[in-house]
Amino acid sequence: MKRRAERQKETRQRIVDATVELHRSIGPLRTTISAIAEKAGVERHTYYAHFPELKDLYQACSGHYVVHHPPPDHCSWTELADHEDRLRRALSEVYAYYGHHEEIFANVLRDAQVDALCAKFTNPVFQNWKRTWSDAVAEGWDAEGERDEALLAAIGFALDFQTWNTLVRQQGLDQERAMELMVGMVRCLMRT
């Protein structure tokens, strides 16, 4: 009985791994059940035995990916007293993370724009990261009311995957120049 449970767990993990790889390479919307089953080396009925609904698969894949590819830890950023240094470190770590996971992030965010189920599992993760990171970077900055709102918006914009993608991939800036552009934007905001 124990061996059977282990085999089921291994099969389930192969399905999750196959799905994550397909989401990375082609995106959730282009990933078919047949492709997942083939890549995992299982039959379709085996896939459905483990994941009767697509939401079950998305939940397993999201949890698996975040555990094995954790986002940058914002706690060390608050140790930096200088606000620009704090923002610079955050951008450095977040942009490196985006660069490393660019393919899967671009695919899932693209598909989340047109698929409600994909959005349900993707958007809260990215929104939570951005909110947590923005709060950590903004901590201690002298801003209240509308100015604080603008500061959080600017930092959130700077830390957004689409901003990184636009600056680095579409505009051709290297990560250092993209970071300095965002630091300069926030600096200008805080001087007004």
Stretches found by the model and what they are:
Residues 23, 56-65, 125:
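Alpha-helical DNA-contacting segments of helix-turn-helix folds
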Residues 135, 152-173, 188-192:
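Amphipathic C-terminal alpha-helical segment
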Residues 92, 96-109, 116-142, 149-153, ...:
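Amphipathic alpha-helical packing segments from all-alpha helical-bundle domains
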Residues 60, 73-103, 126:
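Hydrophobic alpha-helical connector segments
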Residues 1-42, 55-56:
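Basic, helix-initiating cap at the start of DNA-binding domains
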Residues 33, 62-70:
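Short, basic, alpha-helical segments at the C-terminal edge of helix-turn-helix-like DNA-binding modules
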Residues 45:
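Key DNA-contact positions within bacterial/archaeal DNA-binding proteins
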